[in-house]
Amino acid sequence: MQISYFHVPAEMPQDLRPDAAVVIDVLRATTTIARALHNGAEAVQAFASLEDLRAAAAEWPADARLLLGERGGQMLEGFDLGNSPVAVTPEQVAGKRLFMSTTNGTRALDRVREVPLLLTAALPNREAVAQRVLAKQPSHVAIVGSGWEGAYSLEDSLAAGALGHRLLELDPTGSSAANDELTAAVSLWRQWQSDPEACLRTATHGQRLIRLGDHDADFRCCAGLDQLGVVPTQVEPGVLRAA
């Protein structure tokens, strides 16, 4: 199994056809998706476009839906929730369809929505995702970071390295790094693995969240390694369910 990592969706070659893709947006979309599905959400439906989100949500019963969204780290006006993983409690989300749009993560999902096996990962479900990928045995898996507005993000590379490290560890003879970006991400993980929260806080997006207000609970949640067994899996374009 070849494992590639792309810092942002635009770096993934248009002609690349991986068997599997794993999208990462540690701060905070893929952490929130994992937490929401773990807490009983019926599904998370991701949108790059707010217009498309509102149109799709309007067709869903009001008592069975929630609108989640942020731009620049701040909750969107008229939405039920922002992009905080600690806000998607069982009381809030159980049984509901979550219509979600964020600055970076949902756009990354849109880029790889045609890949046969599409998963999302964060630090809390790293082990579960690694085990699922290995069970499927794709010949090539692309780990895709969301970045920040098209640029590199430290925290996504940390999580990509955590996932890549675990895949290589679990399958040392059958898996290999397909690009230097993955090798560098694994090295980054080895540097910060004893204190991933410190890395998240050091990252420019972490600093951005700190400036916006008290996000200590979000940082703790996003940095918690291997705490969730849920694997968000695309079941139809843009729709993720627990698996």
UniProtKB/Swiss-Prot annotation:
Secretion signal, residue range per the UniProt entry: none
Catalyzed reaction equations: (2R)-O-phospho-3-sulfolactate + H2O = (2R)-3-sulfolactate + phosphate
Source organism (scientific name): Synechococcus sp. (strain CC9605)
Domain of life: Bacteria
NCBIfam families: PRK00886.1-2
Protein name: Probable 2-phosphosulfolactate phosphatase
PANTHER family: 2-PHOSPHOSULFOLACTATE PHOSPHATASE-RELATED
A GO molecular function held by the record: sulfopyruvate decarboxylase activity
Designated gene of the protein: comB
Listed InterPro entries: ComB-like, ComB-like_sf
EC number: 3.1.3.71
Keywords, in A-Z order: Hydrolase, Magnesium
